[in-house]
Amino acid sequence: MLSVQPDTKPKGCAGCNRKIKDRYLLKALDKYWHEDCLKCACCDCRLGEVGSTLYTKANLILCRRDYLRLFGVTGNCAACSKLIPAFEMVMRAKENVYHLDCFACQLCNQRFCVGDKFFLKNNMILCQTDYEEGLMKEGYAPQVR
């Protein structure tokens, strides 16, 4: 929630760490901001202007477009075909969107952790082992460097 409050004593800006000496200051995520410093965490657009709407989730401050892109209704999961609600975190691979629990190799069901390599082949998510085995069956072996 964005609130504009009259400034009683200088507070530090969460964006630039400088004192806020403006007549009004902005408060979001229980932190104070200069008007120019309150920005979307994804696209850096300014959110401190009168009439701007901001959204907060997972300790992020977001504009409407990025909030909906990250957390909005995303359609159906590419793995299970069930609807993904707006409040649920998702994983994406190109244009495909997945529930976190569904983001796994579609051959061996190995779940992926942050930083794991995965491959998208014929609209299927594959782990590195299954991807390379598929390439071997097709007669192509990736070069190891």
UniProtKB/Swiss-Prot annotation:
Return the protein name: LIM domain only protein 3
Question: What species is this protein from?
Answer: Danio rerio (Zebrafish)
Q: Which residues form the LIM zinc-binding domain?
A: 11-73, 75-137
Provide an example Pfam family for this protein: LIM
Q: Which InterPro entries match?
A: LMO_RBTN_TF, Znf_LIM
Keyword list (alphabetical) reads: LIM domain, Metal-binding, Repeat, Zinc
Record-level Gene Ontology MF annotations: DNA-binding transcription factor binding; metal ion binding; transcription coactivator activity
Please provide, in alphabetical order, the Gene Ontology terms of the cellular component aspect for this entry. Answer: nucleus
An example GO biological process term is: positive regulation of transcription by RNA polymerase II
